[in-house]
Amino acid sequence: MSYPADDYESEAAYDPYAYPSDYDMHTGDPKQDLAYERQYEQQTYQVIPEVIKNFIQYFHKTVSDLIDQKVYELQASRVSSDVIDQKVYEIQDIYENSWTKLTERFFKNTPWPEAEAIAPQVGNDAVFLILYKELYYRHIYAKVSGGPSLEQRFESYYNYCNLFNYILNADGPAPLELPNQWLWDIIDEFIYQFQSFSQYRCKTAKKSEEEIDFLRSNPKIWNVHSVLNVLHSLVDKSNINRQLEVYTSGGDPESVAGEYGRHSLYKMLGYFSLVGLLRLHSLLGDYYQAIKVLENIELNKKSMYSRVPECQVTTYYYVGFAYLTMRRYQDAIRVFANILLYIQRTKSMFQRTTYKYEMINKQNEQMHALLAIALTMYPMRIDESIHLQLREKYGDKMLRMQKGDPQVYEELFSYSCPKFLSPVVPNYDNVHPNYHKEPFLQQLKVFSDEVQQQAQLSTIRSFLKLYTTMPVAKLAGFLDLTEQEFRIQLLVFKHKMKNLVWTSGISALDGEFQSASEVDFYIDKDMIHIADTKVARRYGDFFIRQIHKFEELNRTLKKMGQRP
């Protein structure tokens, strides 16, 4: 059900939950509408337009009705019902459409009314006010000029504590359901605000003594342990790992879900928390642990849990980045190519929602840059359409990387890597001006060292492709290296081109050592023997598959034409 301001011209039947049409503030006269909106922008936040008041009341009634219905379902020992599903759908419409449109119209660069101002409109409903504050502070972080103040950062943290305490510390399952998109956004924003605060507290140059004292006296606010504790608690409460384990083995996850995990709220929060842990460990530079938390998620299969595109894109971005830093180049390339192909095929779907499109488009660009790095360091064949996109975006930069230009590597890594952070509270008495950059600089140094070790490999590969046998000393001369230096570089080539590659199994950490290099060689005394291992592209199979698809389509069209 849409919020009536979105379709005020329609002549729909009376709906007791809808707003009367006279609450819509459009007069039909563009000049009057513009004058009204300008007048509103000059008012204080305590003066709330009727359209916003009634939107809040409608929003509250929808959430309140859902909670009442959920209480009834829990008392009847039922997990869900069509009524619950309908209410969740209504909340999703409010969340994704009405809230976004009203924000754009009234609060584009200013905060929504404070919770205290709208509390009388909703009967001081504690649960609704927690949900409202979650949206309120998220909007301040995203759109309000200057971002959140120190006080607002603390208040947002306390609000998340209240939300998670309500969900985790209830005597039984909390009588609440929310759309999957909102649940994902809660986890995503929770980690983003922790990341933002970790950077904020390290930048002390422009902070007053009062602010620094306030930070010093509250070290547990946005503490990494509390963030990890929330995510692990949601995972444990939902029993999501056991559910995924049973699901991937073909069983019924409901059979092991437990009292809480049977409910969509807990199940989806548990799943999204696993992705949140992947992201958090990546931000902290612990890539092995980042992938390990997903050991029960089979990335190479479509999952019933992956219903939110942003969650899927985020998962592949961080898994691909972790693979890249662990020198599992084949796996990184496979992961990036798969998700980029998915984005390419579904891009039009995201363009309907601006905020989704912006986020996915940014990660899409970052993953193209990471794929360019991975393919330069470990050349292999990928999907032709992705390869074409990559050449258009980064063709020149890839050529420069192949020639060993470290500046391009650093530029692409800096653009596409996550915003690394330090979990440690800084020493406020002596904070270095670039202290907030140290985690990034450390990761950049490790990456640059790896690039430096492989600087000669691209040139060596191009020479090896030209010959089948050659004296080691002669080939070393072509490269202006001594024979001993060249033998060392050949050993480096062998070592770096052999990767741990996922082949089967659920855990993304599983794998066996393989080499997908297009050339291989061995040294017999003073001679190097080279073999071209490149597999010729089998065009015949491609055309046969397309012919079968065309014939199937033809048969389907003929059947459709025969219908009366």
UniProtKB/Swiss-Prot annotation:
The keyword Protein biosynthesis is annotated on this UniProt entry: yes
Residues modified to N6-acetyllysine: 465, 549
Phosphoserine PTM positions: 21
GO molecular function, one term: translation initiation factor activity
Gene Ontology BP term (one): formation of cytoplasmic translation initiation complex
Localization, UniProt: Cytoplasm
Modification N-acetylserine, positions: 2
Ranges where the PCI domain occurs: 331-537
Subunit text: Component of the eukaryotic translation initiation factor 3 (eIF-3) complex, which is composed of 13 subunits: EIF3A, EIF3B, EIF3C, EIF3D, EIF3E, EIF3F, EIF3G, EIF3H, EIF3I, EIF3J, EIF3K, EIF3L and EIF3M. The eIF-3 complex appears to include 3 stable modules: module A is composed of EIF3A, EIF3B, EIF3G and EIF3I; module B is composed of EIF3F, EIF3H, and EIF3M; and module C is composed of EIF3C, EIF3D, EIF3E, EIF3K and EIF3L. EIF3C of module C binds EIF3B of module A and EIF3H of module B, thereby linking the three modules. EIF3J is a labile subunit that binds to the eIF-3 complex via EIF3B.
Protein name listed in UniProt: Eukaryotic translation initiation factor 3 subunit L
Organism, scientific name: Pan troglodytes
Gene designation: EIF3L
